[in-house]
Design a protein with these regions (language model features):
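Context-gated lysine
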Residues: 1-4, 28, 66, 89, ...
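Conserved N-proximal alpha/beta basic substrate-recognition cap immediately N-terminal to
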Residues: 1-81
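Pocket-edge structural micro-motifs
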Residues: 11, 28, 55, 102, ...
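Short, well-ordered, mixed-charge alpha-helical segments that flank or form enzyme active sites
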Residues: 32-35, 60-66, 70, 87-90, ...
Length: 171
């Protein structure tokens, strides 16, 4: 606890009930599917029994990671979240160069760059919004070629270099 550079130590793997744990760290990559919901519901029960669950289960259920970023608009490019292809086309017309992505994706999967006049724009947008799914379109930032960085806070302090996703040459 007193060493600010070593937050945790790992013991050998063992099985126990959740309520036997002091702390549980919940971090799971998308998608948010039925299994994710069930996991967070079980963790909510452990939390109610006094287990410290880092990344509160209710918060994980309530906030999509991509949508949560929009709480800080000063840190985000212009963004449209919709299921309406016509609205997306107007956004592309306004900004000329955008990135379109599903709300439940991760790791750069199913992210598309669309420029005004792109002949694939319709099929990309229709695929992302299939079945009435919400999607996100953002103004393209050329600086992304240097990578994006995620900020991890521990006890309110940022941990340097927690996660950086740097596009590969063909991405």
């Amino acid at each position: 606890k007193d060493d600010k550079y070593h937050y945790v130590s790992f013991a050998e793997r063992f099985e126990c009930g959740l309520t036997e744990m002091d702390v549980v760290l919940m971090r799971k990559d998308p998608p948010v599917d039925a299994q994710f919901i069930h996991d967070t519901q079980i963790l909510s029960m452990a939390e109610a029994e006094g287990v410290l669950v880092v990344n509160r289960p209710q918060g994980l259920r309530d906030f999509n990671e991509k949508l949560a970023a929009l709480l800080f608009p000063q840190c985000c490019p212009e963004t449209l979240v919709s299921r309406n292809v016509t609205q997306f086309k107007e956004f592309i017309r306004l900004h000329g160069d955008v990135v379109a992505k599903p709300l439940d994706g991760m790791g750069g999967k199913s992210i598309f760059r669309i420029r005004q006049g792109d002949s694939n724009a319709n099929v990309i947008l229709e695929t992302l919004t299939a079945g009435g799914a919400l999607a996100m379109v953002q103004r393209y930032l050329p600086e992304i070629s240097a990578g994006d960085k995620r900020i991890l806070l521990v006890d309110g302090e940022p941990v340097p270099f927690a996660l950086a996703r740097i596009p590969q040459g063909d991405e």
